[in-house]
């Protein structure tokens, strides 16, 4: 009798995706982050669901309801901090996952890559809206500053911003709709992740060499299930260390002050995972220019397949491109640091140089490095 997991309509899908899936024999720990992102998403949905049971999306009670969750709800504090720090872990995994894709040329799977970019945008939107919900000072002013950027769009900008706000400023209507969107978006992300996986399984996984691995496949279970479990244990360990020892390490102290439209905090800045984009936004003195640079800093990922000039897929055997990649990583870390600094000398010029470098490395230096490597190998 044939195994039920191979015949049952539902179990067959799970089997083909997680059990009998043919996987390359040589994929490294950089391939763990896909499953870790899945774990992060499930964790965020579950903790978020329990938070939503006690949260009130109203300007007068939102801040108090979060305090109530932390003080009065059984284990509310751990749920709240797992959700807040879970977002940080989510973005760490996201950046690693995207970085892996760039390094090993995974962007040549066009559909998978493009859905991945959409997933990145959706996750960033969700995190932004979630940051507004506690209705602290940084929640309110972050929402005001970021939504206001849309007013830079010619002709329709002002109307668009007021439409999003549901009034003439960030107020009750804004908070309510942000809560509604923040609740629904993770489920949209989950659906998109399924499509992401569907397209990936059409081609099979890439591997560190970038060479087709059809001749050497192994079953996903037990080899990569056990490897993913190790990654998951490490993820949860780091998350719980954050939650239980330094829950506010990555947060902003200003968000423990209730939102006050009459008092602007001295330094308005987003959560750490948006600082690189925020630095790029601030480095351009023009409002529309800044917004365009902000969007393009992420949207540039879409054109990565067009910028691939190398005859090899992966960077594994391309030392010049490897140098470019790690300079890009250093540049992103510099931008992240600058995004959290006040707008004054020398931070302004460092931010502008780092922003120019970011686009220069991706659009010019990496493609040129690839051409040089092709010529060195006489290809």
Curated annotation (Swiss-Prot):
Annotated keywords: Electron transport, Heme, Iron, Membrane, Metal-binding, Mitochondrion, Mitochondrion inner membrane, Respiratory chain, Transmembrane, Transmembrane helix, Transport, Ubiquinone
UniProt subcellular location: Mitochondrion inner membrane
Keyword set includes Plastid: no
Cofactor dependence: heme b
GO MF term set: metal ion binding; ubiquinol-cytochrome-c reductase activity
Entry function: Component of the ubiquinol-cytochrome c reductase complex (complex III or cytochrome b-c1 complex) that is part of the mitochondrial respiratory chain. The b-c1 complex mediates electron transfer from ubiquinol to cytochrome c. Contributes to the generation of a proton gradient across the mitochondrial membrane that is then used for ATP synthesis.
Subunit structure: The cytochrome bc1 complex contains 11 subunits: 3 respiratory subunits (MT-CYB, CYC1 and UQCRFS1), 2 core proteins (UQCRC1 and UQCRC2) and 6 low-molecular weight proteins (UQCRH/QCR6, UQCRB/QCR7, UQCRQ/QCR8, UQCR10/QCR9, UQCR11/QCR10 and a cleavage product of UQCRFS1). This cytochrome bc1 complex then forms a dimer.
Family: Belongs to the cytochrome b family.
Note: Heme 1 (or BL or b562) is low-potential and absorbs at about 562 nm, and heme 2 (or BH or b566) is high-potential and absorbs at about 566 nm.
Name of the protein in question: Cytochrome b
């Amino acid at each position: 009798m044939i195994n039920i997991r191979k015949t049952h309509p539902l179990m067959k899908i799970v089997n083909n995706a997680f059990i009998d899936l043919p996987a390359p024999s040589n994929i490294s720990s950089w391939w763990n982050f896909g499953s870790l992102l899945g774990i992060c998403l499930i964790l965020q949905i579950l903790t978020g669901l329990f938070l939503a049971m006690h949260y009130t999306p109203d300007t007068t009670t939102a801040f108090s309801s979060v305090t109530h969750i932390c003080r009065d709800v059984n284990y509310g504090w751990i749920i709240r901090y797992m959700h807040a720090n879970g977002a940080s872990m989510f973005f760490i995994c996201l950046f690693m996952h995207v970085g892996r894709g760039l390094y090993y040329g995974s962007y040549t799977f066009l559909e998978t890559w493009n859905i991945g970019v959409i997933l990145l945008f959706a996750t960033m939107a969700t995190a932004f809206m979630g940051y507004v919900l506690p209705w602290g000072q940084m929640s309110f002013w972050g929402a005001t500053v970021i939504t206001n950027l849309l007013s830079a769009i010619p002709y329709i900008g002002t109307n668009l911003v007021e439409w999003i706000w549901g009034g003439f400023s960030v107020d009750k209507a804004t908070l309510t709709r942000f809560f509604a969107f923040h609740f629904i978006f993770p489920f949209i992300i989950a659906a998109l992740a399924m499509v992401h996986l569907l397209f990936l399984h059409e081609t099979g996984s890439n591997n560190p060499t970038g060479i087709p691995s059809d001749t050497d496949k192994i079953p996903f279970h037990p080899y990569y299930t056990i490897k993913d479990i190790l990654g998951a244990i490490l993820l949860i360990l780091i998350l719980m260390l954050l939650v239980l020892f330094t829950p506010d390490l990555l947060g902003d102290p200003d968000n423990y002050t209730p939102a006050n439209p009459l008092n602007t905090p001295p330094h308005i800045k987003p959560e750490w995972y948006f600082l690189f984009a925020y630095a790029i936004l601030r480095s351009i003195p023009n409002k529309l220019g800044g917004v365009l640079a902000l969007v393009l800093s992420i949207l540039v990922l879409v054109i990565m397949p067009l910028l691939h000039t190398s005859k090899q897929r992966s960077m594994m055997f391309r030392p010049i491109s490897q140098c470019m990649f790690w300079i890009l990583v250093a540049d992103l870390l510099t931008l992240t640091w600058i995004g959290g600094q006040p707008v004054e000398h020398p931070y302004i010029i460092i931010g502008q140089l780092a922003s120019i470098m970011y686009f220069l490395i991706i659009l010019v230096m990496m493609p040129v490095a690839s051409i040089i490597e092709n010529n060195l190998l006489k290809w």
